[in-house]
A protein has these predicted regions:
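A contiguous active-site-proximal alpha/beta segment in oxidoreductase catalytic domains
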Residues: 97-154
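Mid-domain beta-loop-alpha active-site segment that forms a flexible
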Residues: 120-127, 150-181, 194-195
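C-terminal helix-rich "cap/oligomerization" subdomain common to oxidoreductases
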Residues: 1, 66-69, 291-332
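Hydrophobic residues in well-ordered beta-strands that form the structural core
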Residues: 55, 92, 117-119, 143, ...
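Contiguous beta-strand/loop segments that form the cofactor/metal-binding neighborhood of enzyme cores
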Residues: 168-247, 279-300
């Protein structure tokens, strides 16, 4: 078995260049080249890394076993479908596609062609999220704020697909229950699509998630707060820090962390503790690329599969459609 996978990058804008530079550092990757419709961009990064600037997608495909697709969302499906049918494993940046129908087709092709697909939901690999891996997470109420300053990149899709998908993916991963209802609102301020959105998602087990995403905010914020029966968990994605507060019955023993004292009396007494679990010092993007290549080499499932990404798209699509319907009603 080869110990390195021949891989190429399609789309070398800001993020695509980062993919290429990191793949050059990954031991299991043999970065053979890049392709971009902007020939100058491709040649510049290729020269920097000492790889080839391919003249077409077909030329790149013929020289690779796997491809990292970092092109605009609108062409994800076209590129991935074409490459998978040629037997190429695909890492696809989020969102997986521009529509649910396209995402369904990606899943079908991947299964039929027996190729690996991993989708770039990078917050799964945020140090703060990794720091919580030892905890049993059963959140019943989740509050998310993902606010960013305006940048012209990514405005071809609504903020729901650009930013909110990160939180949708995490919530579906944390709350092991089916979605029962979604209530959403949003508005376009600068772009022709939705720039700020809020969604309230209810689950069959009674859990509720409230998500707000904006790409027109003055002060950036990427935070999630989760409340469950025995405690409260706060995640600061930007700082890579997780904080855990627990309220435990004294007879069950005091969990690790700083003891903040006891609240309540009698049967209602609870010991309150605080912990800031150690977060691993990792490059999240490099880690997800390494895991993708590991799944190709070992023929194991990818950590964020096309089927998981499809579930995210179904929720995101419902949110976008609700917002569009409310806009139609307002225009009557």
């Amino acid at each position: 078995m080869n110990e390195r996978i021949k891989i190429g990058v399609i789309g070398v804008g800001h993020l695509g260049q980062t993919h290429a530079r990191l793949l050059k550092q990954v031991k299991t990757a043999d970065l053979v080249g890049v392709y971009d419709v902007d020939r100058t961009k491709a040649e510049n990064i290729a020269a920097e890394l000492g790889v080839k600037a391919f003249g077409s997608v077909d030329e790149l495909a013929q020289s690779t076993e796997a491809v990292s697709i970092v092109a605009p969302t609108s062409v994800h499906y076209e590129l991935a479908a074409r490459l998978m049918k040629e037997g190429r494993h695909c890492f696809i940046e989020k969102p997986v596609t521009a529509s649910v129908k396209e995402a369904e087709e990606i899943c079908a092709i991947a299964d039929r062609e027996n190729v690996k697909v991993q989708v770039g939901h990078i917050e799964r690999f945020n140090p703060a999220v990794l720091a919580l891996s030892h905890l049993k997470l059963e959140p019943m109420f989740v509050e998310c704020h993902r606010l960013a300053q305006f940048k012209p990149r990514g405005i071809d899709v609504a903020v729901v697909l650009d930013l909110m998908v990160h939180d949708i993916d995490l919530i579906l991963n944390f709350i092991k229950s089916s979605v029962t209802s979604i209530d959403a609102s949003g508005v376009g301020v600068i772009s022709d699509t939705v720039d700020i959105a809020n969604a309230r998602i209810k689950f069959a087990n009674g859990a509720v998630a409230n998500l707000t995403s904006s790409r027109i905010s003055q002060h950036p914020m990427r935070k999630m707060r989760m409340f469950q029966r025995d405690g409260y968990i706060s995640i600061d994605f930007a700082e890579g820090i997780a904080e855990v507060y627990r309220a435990t019955k004294p007879e069950l023993g005091v969990p690790s962390g700083l003891n903040l004292g006891t609240i309540g009396i009698g049967d209602a007494a609870r010991v309150v503790t605080y912990e800031q679990p150690e977060a691993p010092q990792v490059n999240s993007l490099k880690m997800e690329l390494e895991l993708f290549l590991q799944s190709v080499l070992a023929d194991t499932p990818t950590v964020v599969s096309a089927h998981e990404a499809l579930k995210v798209m179904v929720v995101a699509d419902s949110i976008v459609k609700q917002i569009e319907e409310s806009k139609k009603l307002l225009s009557l």
